[in-house]
């Protein structure tokens, strides 16, 4: 090996640089192998073997950093390249036009910008990831604003619901109180303990009408007494076989006195009274010695009938009912004595 020759070599992948300096055969200085001196150069900073151990990667990394690191690791041992503002502006404008990168478009952009197609593809990929992140952020902000608005509306509706519920409860209580008060006032109006009965109420009557009212009251009482007596006479003694109704009048004539009684819709108190329906016991004719029919011409009909005194007595005896009615009224009208008579329907 010639003296003063400097040899620089790289032995193997990742072996580092080797510097060999030959100082000649008679040169001074200690060394190995006749004054030969070996000097090992420094290893490269970004070596493949020590790259993973010497460089510490942060725990949280963005997709852009990962892609750039992967891309530039492939470019070793070349230097990491930065894009100029003009290149970034052109790429941004192209991304706004179309966010998807076709192969022809990628090659054209790389030629215009003086970059490799791989660099253009990585930039578009990173830019698309950032765009999606921004889009998600905008969507989240919009949805959050909508949620806040709906939450506020929900709270307002709940407050209105509580307010309306309280109003309904108060109105219901007032209505119940009003109904209770109305029922109490109605009951008090119907039954007032301090008011007198209707029979005890006295009506003020003028003095001029008092005699007429007294006479009417006396006549009414007398009529009631006569009606009671007539009912006693009409009763058969069996305790209720004779029925008296208010639909018709049974007139008993004794002189000038007339008694109003009722019996039309029920059976006659005589047994077998259906046979003698519409028969009348009229004034007795003393000359003929019998009882005339109610018809003026004296001719009997199928419905009406005429009985004589003896026959009438036999009729009453056969049915088991004996009714004795005597009336001694001495009053005479037109010189003739008027006997008592009965009439029924």
UniProtKB/Swiss-Prot annotation:
Tissue note: Expressed in seedlings, stems, leaf sheaths and blades and panicles.
One GO biological process term: positive regulation of DNA-templated transcription
Region (Disordered): 220-241
DNA-binding region: 76-135
Location of the protein in the cell: Nucleus
GO CC annotation terms, alphabetical: nucleus
Highest taxon of source: Eukaryota
Region (Leucine-zipper): 134-178
Gene3D superfamilies: Homeodomain-like
Molecular functions per Gene Ontology: DNA-binding transcription factor activity, RNA polymerase II-specific; sequence-specific DNA binding
The keyword Ubl conjugation belongs to this UniProt entry's keyword annotation: no
Keywords: DNA-binding, Homeobox, Nucleus, Transcription, Transcription regulation
Record bears the keyword Nucleus: yes
First-listed, main subcellular location of the protein, grouped into a coarse class: nucleus
PANTHER family xref list: HOMEOBOX-LEUCINE ZIPPER PROTEIN, HOMEOBOX-LEUCINE ZIPPER PROTEIN HAT5
Role noted for this protein: Probable transcription factor.
Similarity comment: Belongs to the HD-ZIP homeobox family. Class I subfamily.
Protein name, entry field: Homeobox-leucine zipper protein HOX16
Gene: HOX16
């Amino acid at each position: 090996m010639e003296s003063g020759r400097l040899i620089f070599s790289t032995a193997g992948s990742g072996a580092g640089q080797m510097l060999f300096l030959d100082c000649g055969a008679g040169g001074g200085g200690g060394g190995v192998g006749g004054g030969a001196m070996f000097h090992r150069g420094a290893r490269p900073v970004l070596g493949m073997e020590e790259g993973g151990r010497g460089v510490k990667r942060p725990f949280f990394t963005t997709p852009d950093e990962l892609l750039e690191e992967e891309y530039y690791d492939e470019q070793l041992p070349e230097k990491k390249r930065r894009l100029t503002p003009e290149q970034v502006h052109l790429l941004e404008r192209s991304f706004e036009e179309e966010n998807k990168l076709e192969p022809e478009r990628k090659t054209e952009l790389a030629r215009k910008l003086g970059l490799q197609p791989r660099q253009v593809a990585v930039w578009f990929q990173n830019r698309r990831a950032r765009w999606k992140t921004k889009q998600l952020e905008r969507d989240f902000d919009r949805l959050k604003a909508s949620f806040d608005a709906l939450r506020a509306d929900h709270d307002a509706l709940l407050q209105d619901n509580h307010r309306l519920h309280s109003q309904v409860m108060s109105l219901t209580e007032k209505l119940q109180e009003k109904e209770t008060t109305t029922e109490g006032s109605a009951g008090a109006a119907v039954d007032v303990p301090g008011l007198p009965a209707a029979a005890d109420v006295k009506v003020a009557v003028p003095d001029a009408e008092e005699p007429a009212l007294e006479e009417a009251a006396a006549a009414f009482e007398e009529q009631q007494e006569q009606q009671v007596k007539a009912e006693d006479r009409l009763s058969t003694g069996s305790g209720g076989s004779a029925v008296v109704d208010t639909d018709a009048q049974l007139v008993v004539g004794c002189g000038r006195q007339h008694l109003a009684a009722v019996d039309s819709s029920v059976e006659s108190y005589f047994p077998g009274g259906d046979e003698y329906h519409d028969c009348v016991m009229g004034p007795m004719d003393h000359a003929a010695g019998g009882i005339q029919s109610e018809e003026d011409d004296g001719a009997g009909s199928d419905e009406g009938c005429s009985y004589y005194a003896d026959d009438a007595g036999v009729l009453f005896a056969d049915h088991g009912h004996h009714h004795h009615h005597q009336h001694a009224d001495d009053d005479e009208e037109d010189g003739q004595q008027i006997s008592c008579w009965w009439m029924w329907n």
